[in-house]
Curated annotation (Swiss-Prot):
Annotated site, Transition state stabilizer, chain positions: 17, 24
Name the record gives this protein: 2-C-methyl-D-erythritol 4-phosphate cytidylyltransferase
EC numbers, comma separated: 2.7.7.60
Organism: Corynebacterium jeikeium (strain K411)
SUPFAM superfamilies: Nucleotide-diphospho-sugar transferases (SSF53448)
GO biological process, alphabetically ordered: isopentenyl diphosphate biosynthetic process, methylerythritol 4-phosphate pathway
Catalysis performed (reactions): 2-C-methyl-D-erythritol 4-phosphate + CTP + H(+) = 4-CDP-2-C-methyl-D-erythritol + diphosphate
Pfam families named in the record: IspD
Its biological purpose: Catalyzes the formation of 4-diphosphocytidyl-2-C-methyl-D-erythritol from CTP and 2-C-methyl-D-erythritol 4-phosphate (MEP).
Coiled coil regions in record: none
Swiss-Prot/TrEMBL keywords: Isoprene biosynthesis, Nucleotidyltransferase, Transferase
Feature type site, description Positions MEP for the nucleophilic attack: 184, 256
Gene Ontology terms, MF aspect: 2-C-methyl-D-erythritol 4-phosphate cytidylyltransferase activity
Amino acid sequence: MTANVYALVAAAGSGTRLGFDTPKAFVELNGRSLLERSLDGLAASQSIEETIVLVSENMRDHAERIVNDPINVAEWAPMTVSVELGGGERFDSVYAGLVAIQRRLSAADEAPEGRFVAVHDAARCLTPPAMIAEVVDRARRGVADGSWYGAIPVLPVVDTIKVIDAPTSGPRAGQTVVEQTPDRASLRAAATPQVFDLGKLIEANEQYLRTTEISSAHAVDRVGASPLPLVTDDASLMEMAGFPVVAVDADPLAMKITTAQDYRVAQMILNGSEG
């Protein structure tokens, strides 16, 4: 039987900024990998039925061992977890996950309509289950009456943000020049999981590929630098396609572990909650 709510966990990143030789998703945090902790949260939310982990080729066996570990399988049940090969860029990985979901649905002679997908980063492994459930619920509410087609968690921007430019000619050539200061009251930092109507996210991805004249099959196979315009989250694709998405206040624990400093902060949080 196919799922009504899927999750895709992006875990193919190298994590060089974190300072470990191991890819970021597989770095241990207080004895449990970031990937396992992110799956713990998805399962505990009781909102996700099936999760697909997207990894690089060299970490596929490691990921398979993690998701097939009997203790993990029991811990995450009834949510099921499987592994698929991701891509060179985040977009490629998520698109590969969407293709995998479509294969499952086609095999069962079912369609994407009425289903949802939550796209999550393994690096946001402390995201509270209650927040995940709230984002899924908000997406469901909008799709039910066609008011919106997805929901994303967002965090306030506390710093003053500057738009900059780097002119290559003129008196300021070689300098970083401040162009403008947007009002931070209207700015938010996007977090994950981002939850969408499955059919609409597939459509948004296909529109993006058509716009850039890249075939779907080529997109799945690409490795390395992408010729596509940079897309750093899935809500951006929904925006481009004209599908409304609403924002949900995120819990600060939905922080992304990217640098060594982030890692130390996460350790302190866990030491306080698990001690």
